[in-house]
A protein has these predicted regions:
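A charged, amphipathic alpha-helical module
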Residues: 2-65, 179, 183-312, 341
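Generic N-terminal leader/targeting and pre-domain segments
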Residues: 16-28, 33-121, 125
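Short hydrophobic segments within beta-strands
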Residues: 70, 275-277, 367
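Redox- and metal-dependent alpha/beta enzyme cores, enriched for Fe-S-associated oxidoreductases
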Residues: 72-73, 78-92, 99-100, 279-344, ...
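Acidic/His-rich segments in extracytoplasmic proteins that coordinate ligands and/or metal ions
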Residues: 117-184
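A short, acidic, amphipathic alpha-helical segment used as a generic capping/interface helix at domain edges
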Residues: 119, 343-360, 377-378
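Proline-aspartate-enriched helix->loop->beta-strand connector
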Residues: 130, 356, 360-366
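C-terminal regions of proteins
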Residues: 383, 387, 393-423
Length: 423
């Protein structure tokens, strides 16, 4: 059913959803902060940032143009070079998922419903309404959102990706899409993407990537930070000022590398080391990672598009001219991607095996949101791969609702105990 806005029903839906979002977020953050007991001061910035964003407290007026993105496959360097600021719309909120469900089929993925609910209820908490939403053709459900009649007044831009990434034809197609995107961005923002602006944007994002890769490296060693906290740090990149985010990740890394503090919420060095993969955990939907670490497991790495895949891979530029920088950007966003929207997708197998070796992983937890067919379809292949490698895997199908907590708790506890018995 279409709910045109503004009207009284829209006002009630929007107000109620935003209030429940604050309650959800505060509940998760209070739990995380209680577990950490303030022993890692560097995390306070990220806790506060997530809390403030959920409450809409970061949305102070400025003259910047904001462009929303719905997927990790958007080359954000081009958005910065065009004089705008990217903000990710992907949401982990159950209340926003319920708002989005007003429009979507009952079996839609929670992430897609929550993303649409966030956009529709004007809960992208940035200083000014985004001038566009960039929507790559990755997820089958997300790419149809622009066609839903909901009275939305933010224009969608469809960024076309090929269904495969290994063929020469696919790469040529994607290069063409990225070039077209760069030209269209200039029309959206009214600012030309010059060589100097694009170089500065690539270097700006590269500094953030370098800080994140250092955090990733620190997590390979003995437990110093909970995996749930590391995922939160990555999630805040969605909407934080990039320079401020990079500075605070650098400070956190220094603190962790010095070994000055240890989070009491982290299990001992003999705790089972867990790798997370599948449908991404996005704040405040930390149901699964919080449970895993509460049960005595330690999340040492993840393969989520909302955290590790968001920032790990960098742009490799040979020469700082437009003829090299744009193809280099296209390469970074296509060739490094392990999203199941691509077929074949053996790169994902190789990446998971690399994580298992580098992070000394004891077990893999594979999360699939109900309705997320892409990750569900790949689960059997990944399960067979884990069996060959003698790595136990727990497959979990869930959504944003808290109703299955009891059942999940029982299964996760049994899985952690079985991993402990193997050590």
């Amino acid at each position: 059913m279409m709910i045109q806005k503004p009207n009284k029903r829209y006002d009630r839906l929007s107000t109620a959803s935003k209030k429940r979002l604050v309650i959800e977020s505060d509940s998760v953050l209070n739990e995380l902060q209680k577990e950490s007991a303030g022993t890692i001061p560097g995390m306070d910035y990220f806790y506060g940032l997530a809390r403030s964003y959920s409450r809409g407290e970061l949305a102070k007026q400025d003259k910047k143009k904001y462009i929303a993105t719905s997927c990790v496959q958007v080359p954000i360097e081009l958005i910065y070079a065009a004089g705008a600021v990217p903000v990710r719309t992907c949401s982990g909120s159950h209340s926003m998922s319920q708002a989005g469900a007003e429009f979507l089929p009952a079996k839609s993925c929670s992430l897609v419903s929550a993303t649409f609910g966030t956009i529709y209820t004007d809960s992208i908490h940035v200083p000014s309404k985004p001038v566009a939403i960039i929507n790559p053709t990755t997820c089958d459900q997300k790419k149809k959102l622009s066609e839903i009649p909901s009275g939305m007044d933010i224009p969608y831009y469809t960024l076309e990706l090929p269904p495969t990434k290994d063929s020469e034809e696919a790469q040529i197609y994607w290069y063409s899409s990225v070039k077209k995107f760069s030209r269209d961005l200039e029309g959206i923002t009214g600012k030309r993407i010059t060589r100097s602006r694009l170089k500065a944007a690539i270097l700006k994002v590269a500094r953030a990537q370098q800080a994140f890769r250092q955090l990733h490296q620190i997590r390979k060693e003995h437990p110093t930070i909970r995996g749930t906290d590391a995922i939160l740090v990555a999630n805040t990149f969605f909407y934080d000022d990039i320079d401020s985010w990079t500075q605070h990740v650098d400070s956190l890394n220094h603190e962790l590398a010095q070994g000055l503090h240890k989070d009491p919420g982290i299990s001992g060095n003999n705790a089972p080391r867990i790798l997370l993969t599948g449908s991404p955990s996005i704040f405040p939907n930390f149901k699964l990672p919080v449970m895993i670490e509460a049960m005595g497991g330690h999340i040492v790495a993840d393969e989520f598009c909302s955290s590790n895949r968001l920032l790990y891979d960098t742009v490799a530029v040979d020469e700082w001219n437009m003829y090299d920088m744009i193809p280099a950007l296209a390469d970074r966003y296509l060739k490094a991607c392990t999203c199941p929207c691509f077929t074949p997708n053996q790169d994902r197998d190789r990446k998971l095996l690399s994580y298992i070796k580098d992070f000394r992983v004891d077990g893999l937890v594979y999360q699939t949101f109900s309705g997320c067919q892409l990750y569900e379809l790949e689960s059997s292949r990944i399960g067979s791969l884990m069996e060959q490698e003698n790595i136990p895997m727990l497959y979990i199908e869930t959504d944003y609702s808290p109703d299955d907590r009891g059942q999940l708790s029982t299964r996760i506890e049994a899985f952690i105990e079985s991993l402990s018995a193997r050590k």
